[in-house]
């Protein structure tokens, strides 16, 4: 544990916190509130979609566009440019890429493809979480933020082993941030 008490944490001149909890519990709402009061907000989901999954997402858009002859011709001649427009508030390109297993004729993807994409997401999530210490430094050095909030996303529990004291993700986060778990009732 990085701090022995809440008082010790509050006395620090700069704060770095990672919010954990299941999807929908309010992590992003809290992170946005803190951002509005002067904290640097790091969204793991945003980082996943813009840094580590962007190429997969855009390639999927292009695969779909290639099914339409009009768009296929424009893509092949470099006449159009297709990009994802992921924002903190709109992660739809990421969730759409991850897809839903089911009949491809009805908009689903095969279970094998679904598992492949879930593994890509898992790897991207781990890498995004391991980026946190570097972003704390960047938030301070580049932007002048003293306080840092990491919105970890709802699937943190799927990429860490809390029983392993040497889990690389938990070790990195606990050495650089205060871990705050939010629970719903």
Stretches with model-predicted labels:
Residues 26:
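Conserved glycine(s) of the Walker
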Residues 29-30, 34:
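Hydrophobic positions on the alpha1 helix immediately C-terminal to the Walker A/P-loop
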Residues 58-162:
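ATP-dependent small-molecule kinase phosphotransfer cores
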Residues 1-11:
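Pre-Walker A adenine-sensing motif
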Residues 19:
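Hydrophobic anchor at the beta1->P-loop junction of P-loop NTPases
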Residues 38-53:
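Short beta-strand-centered segment that lines the nucleotide-binding/catalytic pocket of NTP-utilizing
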Residues 151-152, 169-185:
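Conserved phosphate-donor/acceptor-positioning beta-strand/loop module used by diverse small-molecule
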Residues 23:
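The conserved Walker
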